Amino acid sequence: MSGPILVFDSGVGGLSILDEIRRVLPDQNYCYLFDNARLPYGELEEQELIDGCEALITATVAQLGASLVVIACNTASTLVLPVLREALTIPVVGVVPAIKPAALYSQAKHIGLLATPGTIKRSYTHSLIQEFAANCQVELYGSSELVLLAERKASGKQILQGEIAQLLSPIKVSGIDTLVLGCTHFPILKDEIQQYLGDGVLLLDSGKAVAARVSTLIKEESTLNKRQRKGHSKEMIALYTSEVGEGLKKLLAEFGFSTYSKAQTG
């Protein structure tokens, strides 16, 4: 395997995952593919999501010769992983909500899961709760609006604390001491969420766990060349399915992307 690592999401949320991966694998080539034409994924019908993701990702893997795929989207991971693993011959890594560590860290054994409505309703999510948090009271909060707020912030627009409060007020009064950010968009708003909920609520996401898994797979395949220059990846490509504004292009440039263009969708 010598091609780029392909990181996929519906929008810019997966950049939080890519950031963690680059910390442990700074010398790899990366492609960030985001399907912003169909954002937010939490509102899509299951089969529409599966078919669209499979077509887009497999086409991009073939085009770039990608070495590994990261589905940096909780909603897509709950549905698309089995299909992609059957269709592709390279490793495919998904994102799992950090329910297990939340159950371990929670002192009150009262935790919350904040995710898209799609992730909240999946049987996979409820199986995780039964397996890893059976000893906890678990509150479920679904929000697509928070995804769009994260996209706004990423494009350079201001997010008002009142907007956060309007969406998260049920969480603030719930009494939880640990909140799982079960959508990769939500770490973009981590500072705003923490400020609103207060220091008494621990926020957890899956970024570091995904990065560790990717690092293990890459090293197992002996693709990490330790003689490469340290501190910067060699190539950063961004592909999108719908045109992006100047604010988002600026963010991509600041993130280190040298090339960004529309993905080939068929």
From Swiss-Prot:
Pathway entry: Cell wall biogenesis; peptidoglycan biosynthesis
BP-aspect Gene Ontology terms: cell wall organization; peptidoglycan biosynthetic process; regulation of cell shape
GO molecular function per UniProt: glutamate racemase activity
Ligand binding (substrate): D9, S10, Y41, G42, N74, T75, T184, H185
Catalytic reaction(s) noted: L-glutamate = D-glutamate
Gene3D superfamilies: 3.40.50.1860
Catalytic center residues: C73, C183
Transmembrane segments: none
Ranges in coiled-coil conformation: none
Job description of the protein: Provides the (R)-glutamate required for cell wall biosynthesis.
Family of the protein in this entry: Belongs to the aspartate/glutamate racemases family.
Designated name of the protein: Glutamate racemase
Native species: Shewanella woodyi (strain ATCC 51908 / MS32)
Name of the gene encoding the protein in the UniProt record: murI
